[in-house]
Design a protein with these regions (language model features):
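Short, low-complexity intrinsically disordered segments enriched in A/P/G/S/L with frequent Arg
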Residues: 4, 20-21, 39, 47-48
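Catalytic cores of the polymerase beta-like nucleotidyltransferase superfamily
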Residues: 13-17, 26-32, 46-49, 53-550
Length: 550
């Protein structure tokens, strides 16, 4: 398990109400003590009741009778009818049950049948008639029914065993108990009976309700077996802890560290899918903090993990760029929420909040080049010159290795990483029109996202300097808005393009054509001439004459 760095970091997560304590406070005792002068146990007393009070607002306890009322929907009664006609036990399980208690709406329903899940699905099709669409996957023993916007997955109760080099299980028919044993976490192992005689009866052998109430992620059985059998569950563990703002039970967390190397057998696409779900969470930094703490991050994104270091020379230390990165990521998430709430208030936005996951990836990778660019200078101390350019060059390879998309999404992240120092440089100096024009031209349609990222990057603990930066950023934003409004045409490419230059001077693609294009673009950006044909043509001929082009 990785040791935790000390310093200001904990304030990031405490400020946003994140759970970082385990149920037994072994992991952060010294961390809290170093920051607040109190023990982990003392902090746990403050943390857990606070979170439990929050849990009371987002979770309810139900009797079986109340659960039956919550399941009083046509689809569940039809499933009950189908199962009873076939004489088999039938249960709704997993995330749908969990989300009932968390009062989160869900249209994805998993049903376990002690017998043939396919048979119940086919019987349900006969009951529903043409209103239902049924897909059967006989090789997997599963079936899916789509009905009135809901998706119901049917599977027979089963028990599983695994070989060491594969996460593909050997499956046998089993009981409900066998099926609950194989579930990843206690909060996902609860079941509610759908048979008419027991409709609404909760079956919770591992106290998933208690773990939901306490905000704990825990495995039903030995976590070493759970994670070794299917290493993807390690990422699911982190993901659920992040999405639900739960903490990971001590022994479960220790098993993450012991089995971290097993993640190597998981294909990149599955890893990327889980990480994107972490990214979409309300507090994404929590997930990457836990990945680093348990030792998974060095195996998945070693370039990011490598930032978790503080080096000191001649009494001068640089900041921990890993924790800085997580703070920037969290700042971006909060900025997105503020913008969404503002637009929703002004009726400019409807529907659920949809985070910009690629802006968040840009935040995570914005300083990725600092490890390679770090140098010591006797006068300046630690420097990270050109880390933005180095980081931008690293992005495509990281995306390729992680099986993230290599299309416009990767180029968007790469662009923001490359440009993320530009607004800061402008804000740190006299804010000129020409500098802002160049920034808008280079960032294009992504200028607003770039400004969000760069403002999130202002994490200085020097409040005077931070206040000045933010004030200058306000000026930059105002100037961007002003230039967009009055100079929009000027921000476009010059009205005379390379093809016309080649035709006019009878040139082939060459360095000379590039120089002439550059001269026109510079003149437009610097406001030397208007972006109009006549003045640009005069400038073009003048520049061509200087280059000896007739």
């Amino acid at each position: 398990m990785l040791a935790l760095s000390t310093g200001y970091r904990v304030m990031i997560w405490q400020r946003w109400g994140l759970r970082l304590c385990s149920k037994k406070t072994y992991c952060l005792s010294l961390f809290f003590h170093s920051q607040f002068g109190q023990t982990g146990a003392e902090n746990e007393k403050k943390c857990v009741p606070l979170q439990t009070e929050r849990r009371k607002k987002t979770m309810r306890e139900y009797t079986d009778e109340e659960l039956s009322q919550l399941l009083d929907k046509d689809i569940f009664h039809h499933i009950s009818e189908a199962a009873d006609e076939l004489g088999v036990e039938c249960y709704v399980v997993g995330g749908y049950v969990r989300d009932i208690f968390l009062e989160r709406p869900s249209n994805d329903i998993d049903v376990v049948v002690v017998g043939s899940g396919i048979a119940v699905a086919e019987k349900l099709r006969k009951i529903l008639g043409k209103r239902a669409h049924v897909s059967v996957f006989r090789n997997f023993g599963t079936a899916q029914v789509k009905y009135k916007g809901m998706e119901v997955e049917f599977v027979g109760a089963r028990k599983e065993s695994y070989s060491h080099d594969s996460r593909k299980p050997v499956v046998e028919d089993g009981t409900l108990e066998d099926d609950q044993d194989r579930r990843d976490f206690t909060i996902n192992a609860m079941a509610i009976c759908l048979n008419k005689s027991r409709f609404g009866e909760l079956v919770d052998p591992f106290d998933g309700i208690g773990d939901l109430w306490e905000g704990i992620i825990r495995t039903p059985l030995d976590p070493d077996i759970t994670f070794s059998d299917d290493p993807l569950r390690m990422l699911r563990c982190i993901r659920f802890a992040t999405q639900l703002n739960f903490f990971i039970e001590e022994e479960t967390f220790a098993a993450l560290s012991r089995n971290a190397e097993r993640i190597k057998i998981i294909c990149g696409e599955r890893v990327a899918d889980e990480l994107n779900k972490v990214m979409k969470s309300q507090y994404p930094s929590k997930g990457f903090f836990e990945l680093q703490r348990c030792g998974l991050l060095p195996l998945i994104i070693p370039e990011l993990s490598a930032l978790d270091i503080v080096e000191t020379r001649n009494g001068r230390a640089h900041k921990n760029n890993f924790y800085h990165t997580l703070e920037v990521l969290e700042n971006v998430a909060r900025a997105e929420e503020r913008l969404y709430n503002k637009e929703k208030t002004e009726n400019l936005k409807t529907g659920a909040f949809q985070p910009n996951v690629w802006l968040r990836w840009a935040a995570l990778f914005h300083d990725i080049g600092k490890t390679k660019s770090k140098r010591w200078d006797n006068q300046q101390g630690w420097t990270f010159h050109n880390h933005n350019d180095i980081g931008a060059r690293m992005v495509p390879e990281i995306f390729r290795r992680m099986k993230l998309p290599l299309d416009s999404k990767m180029k968007y992240v790469q662009k923001l990483v490359e440009l993320h120092m530009r607004p800061i440089a402008i804000a740190d100096d006299v804010v000129t029109d020409s500098a802002v024009r160049r920034l808008i031209n280079d960032a294009g349609d992504d200028i607003d996202d770039l400004m969000t990222l760069c403002e999130a990057d202002i994490t200085s603990k020097n409040q005077v300097r931070k206040k000045q930066f933010l004030e200058n950023f306000r000026i930059v934003r105002e100037k961007i808005a002003d230039l967009k409004e009055r100079d929009y045409k000027r921000l476009l490419q010059p009205v005379i393009d390379g093809n016309e230059i080649m035709e006019l001077f009878h040139l082939k693609p060459s360095r000379e054509v590039g120089e002439l294009k550059k001269a026109l673009k510079e003149a437009v950006l610097e406001n030397i001439v208007p972006n109009e044909r006549e003045p640009l043509m005069a400038l073009l001929k003048e520049k061509a004459a200087q280059l000896g082009i007739g």
